[in-house]
Amino acid sequence: MVLAPGINEKAGGADKPGDKEGRLRLLDTNDPIFRDVVPKVIAAAPDAILLVATNPLDPMVELTRRLASGKIVLGTGTFLDSLRFKTALADHLEVAPESISALVLGEHGLSSVLLWSKVTIGAVLLDTYLAGRSIDGQTLRRSVEEYVRQGNINVIKGKGASEFGIGTVVARVVEIILRDDCMVIPVSAYSEKYGVALSLPRRVGSSGVLDEFEIEANKEEQEGISRSVEALKTAMKRLDRSQ
């Protein structure tokens, strides 16, 4: 069961470049909508796996988990961010996206963490690939990170909404579950380690999330994940205070 009720980014004012809240700006509006909708969904489909696609994604996953106690809950997470990461790298490096391995973890939002240390092109680490090529690594990084984090805003500015990207990801995650593909993808779910819902590499199949993988991130990336966790915990405290 795909859960996507709520106000979108443009209508909710989360489409402004430089906005420090980003998708979290939608939290106070979509919170009561989920509190109304989720119990009704559970009553209608008590055995359904719940796939959340509403922003702010990770807090909505956590809220759904609380409202649907004991049910299987996950969210599209940073799957779309990771695809944007690969696409941006492919454009800059003139390499097919299928030849690139790249992950975005943490919040599906402004505190997301691009795992640069794990990027490979044809199984070759990015730093090794760039050595001897006339590509400035820092310039590449700034350009790609802006594209990944602001990509939704640029799409909304151009056509009013960003439905096709997330629609493709929703369809793919549903397919993975229905076919029991047991594929490792960056989706959002509650993490016992971090105490909040966020995106990590997880093996997904017909029973939802089957495994959670621990990434050997470098110090900078781990600090980024910690900041993402704190941002999401702060968001959940806002929800708790609203009740």
Predicted regions and their residues:
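NAD(P)H-binding glycine-rich loop region in Rossmannoid oxidoreductase-like domains
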Residues: M1-L27
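Detector for Asparagine
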Residues: N8, N30, N55, N152-N154, ...
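Rossmann-like NAD(P)(H) cofactor-binding subdomain of soluble oxidoreductases
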Residues: G18-A88
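C-terminal substrate-binding/catalytic lobe of Rossmann-fold NAD(P)-dependent dehydrogenases
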Residues: L67-I72, D81-Q243
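N-terminal/domain-start segments enriched in small and hydrophobic, helix-friendly residues
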Residues: I7, L24-R25, R35, E145-V148, ...
